[in-house]
Regions:
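Residues forming the flavin
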Residues: 1-190
Length: 190
């Protein structure tokens, strides 16, 4: 959205969750009471799941195009600490990231972008050229970019039901298992 706004487009960001500050309060409420807001929590809301993660910024090790550098420089321009530009494992804490996300949103709005929070895409109507929001409101659009993360199963189901072509993203899961050396030796050497 930020790049589109910089290029003169007026992106409309439709977010099923809350704005980042409201989301922070919703997450704190969950941690204190155990009461979950299904659309504003550690997974859903402005900033995505990474906002409430351990703060590590995953870097593109083989990024010969310099995209990662651009992202880090953009974060710094919106208030992230400069050391993320040279640290081997850059890190931004949640409190700082909330300020960065909010500053980016404000800049996108200054450039003509628009944000709709608590607005879930519940249907896509390609023939009409519109999205359905919260099962009621229709928004006309010429192009749609979905950045829904992996937890929006209801949205994936809607896309599947609509016949949208999708493919699973490959991923790997690592497991570390420790065994006594004697057991390893016995299994290896008899």
């Amino acid at each position: 959205a930020y790049l589109l706004a910089l290029e003169g487009y007026r992106p409309l960001i439709v977010e099923r969750g809350a704005a980042v500050r409201e989301r922070k309060a919703d997450v704190a409420h969950f941690w204190e009471t155990g009461v979950l807001d299904p659309s504003s929590n550690v997974q859903f809301g402005e900033g995505g799941a990474g906002t409430f993660s351990d703060g590590k910024l995953n870097t593109l090790v083989k990024d010969t195009a310099g995209r990662n550098r651009f992202v880090l420089e953009t974060f710094v321009s919106f208030g992230a600490p400069e050391d993320i530009l040279w640290e081997q494992k850059p890190h931004i804490g949640t409190d700082i990231l909330i300020d960065v996300v909010e500053a980016m949103r404000n800049r996108i709005i200054q450039l003509g972008g628009e944000f709709h929070f608590h607005s879930q895409v519940t249907d896509i109507l390609p023939r009409e050229g519109c999205l359905v929001i919260n099962g009621r409101e229709k928004i006309r659009t010429e192009a749609v970019v979905l950045a829904i993360g992996h937890s929006a199963r209801d949205t994936f189901q809607m896309l599947y039901d609509r016949g949208v072509c999708m493919e699973a993203k490959s991923f790997a899961v690592g497991v570390r298992v420790e065994h006594p050396q004697e057991m390893i030796d016995r299994n290896m050497y008899g």
